[in-house]
Amino acid sequence: RITIDELRITINEQRSKMNVPVMSDLAARGEMPEVLFWVGCAGSFDQRAQKVTGAFVQILNHCKVSFAVLGTEEGCTGDPARRAGNEFLFQMLAANNIATLNGYGIRNIVTTCPHCFNTLKNEYPELGGNYEVMHHSQFIQQLIAEGKLSMQGGGTFKGKRITYHDSCYLGRANGVYEAPRAVLEILDAELVEMKRCKSKGLCCGAGGAQMFKEAEAGEKEVNIERTEEALETKPDIIAAACPFCNTMMTDGVKHAEKEDSVKVYDIAELIVQGNALLEHE
């Protein structure tokens, strides 16, 4: 069993290896980053999601984006608390984060978690936290449009069948459907849509704080249903843009005993593994 302090030490060591600036250090030098990378609880503490964090940091560094993280000053956005009905805890967490962000004068935020994205963008303003918030799919799309990121010949995934799962908090809650698909286009892969996609997409089963509780009794768990829809497209890869969706779809693939033939990746991982970062070295 590992303590929170030990986990934070490990995370600090990983951050140093990845060349991740910390906001407090920049502020001490009177510097302001172009954007604050909000890592989120999953991206900080979940081993699978940490790989997504690392991939996105690689993209930011490769594209020479001026960014920073809050490090140990970053707290949970409070999304799970509010979804579970604990409004007091949500407002307490939000107030602490807003005080930190406003104290640094932060205006631009990017995050790899749609839950953090939705909360920071749509729920913090009523509490005094007004920021320009982007999901990493939007940010990567912007880097591609600016010519800072490209992939000649499609890279590693050229010709592979990829199906993309729409996160509820990115898609239906915020209308972000095209950005992740535009990012996938530079892979020159075959993008195959599920029968329920975009505004009609099916939840992975982790939304509304369901990630942190046991499923109610029923005929089938939601993530199994959703994964079956994904597998119907006969994909080589299931692409996700949310740490919760990534976990649920991965579990669904394991349930179907397809983990050897079907992989679940975040879009940032696909960009890195597709060798997009080598084109500008």
Which sequence ranges carry the predicted segments?
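Iron-sulfur cluster-binding electron-transfer modules in prokaryotic oxidoreductases
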Residues: R1-E281
